[in-house]
Amino acid sequence: MSTIKIKQVKSRIGAPADQKRTLDALGLRKLNRVVEHESTSSILGMVDKVKHLVAIVK
């Protein structure tokens, strides 16, 4: 499978608890951090849930 790089571009402050847990599950705990994951349906679903807080880096 292909991999995607995900970068946190907005702060989690003020976000609902479920979105904070999603960021934790993705491995994003600080602003401007980049993590790499395989492009599975579960990862893409998590990215879609917090799409206003993250960006896909190419």
Curated annotation (Swiss-Prot):
Keyword annotations of the record: Ribonucleoprotein, Ribosomal protein
Native source species: Bacteroides thetaiotaomicron (strain ATCC 29148 / DSM 2079 / JCM 5827 / CCUG 10774 / NCTC 10582 / VPI-5482 / E50)
How this chain assembles, per its entry, is: Part of the 50S ribosomal subunit.
Family named by the database record: Belongs to the universal ribosomal protein uL30 family.
A Gene Ontology BP annotation from the UniProt entry: translation
- Gene Ontology molecular function, alphabetical: structural constituent of ribosome
Annotated protein name in UniProt: Large ribosomal subunit protein uL30
Q: Which GO terms describe its cellular component?
A: cytosolic large ribosomal subunit
Q: Does the keyword Nucleotidyltransferase apply?
A: no
Coiled-coil stretches are none
